[in-house]
Amino acid sequence: MAINETDVKLFVDSWKQGVLDIKNVYDNKGDYQEQASKFLETHYLFETESVLFKPTLTREEIFRNSFDRALSYFIGGDIDEDKGFAIQEWKSIDTDQINILIEDELIIAMWVLSFKSDEVLKVAFTFMLKESSSDLKIKVHHSSLIK
């Protein structure tokens, strides 16, 4: 399958919606842990390969290069500093300034997401994606606050 910019944009939209879906399940007192696990399985290569993951809001344990550490970041867990990024008061997530590079097997996307609650948290993202059996998944994730 030849990956194109539309595929990458759809993946980014799916990732954003996945974060909001975790929040929705959490708000409705559902199994948000299962929802977050599905999100990671759908969007990251943790099950089959090594992944490099530098989340937005980390200070003590900067990198979360395993499934369990990533899960803790998104919903809270083993790591004291984790408050559950995906279960914050996000009402919407807007995309801006998306840049995509596709060269042979190399697929990289960089963009800005605005996480909206009572305030707006602007974050710059870079994903290095890899084609999995039938879809794209994240091999490298780096995100940082824009101040």
Predicted regions located by residue number:
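Short beta-strand edge/turn micro-motifs at domain boundaries
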Residues: I102-M110, D118-K147
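Short, low-complexity N-terminal intrinsically disordered segments enriched in polar/charged residues
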Residues: M1-T48
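Generic ordered-secondary-structure signal
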Residues: S14, E81-K83, Q97, V120-V123, ...
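Generic detection of intrinsically disordered/low-complexity segments and helix-coil linkers/edges
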Residues: K9, Q33, K38-L40, E47, ...
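Surface-exposed, charged secondary-structure patches
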Residues: L52-K116
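Residue-identity detector for threonine
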Residues: T6, T42, T48, T56-T58, ...
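Residue-level marker of positions within ordered structural domains that often coincide
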Residues: L20, S114, S134
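Generic structural hydrophobic/aromatic packing signal, biased to beta-strands
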Residues: W15, T95, I100, F127-L129
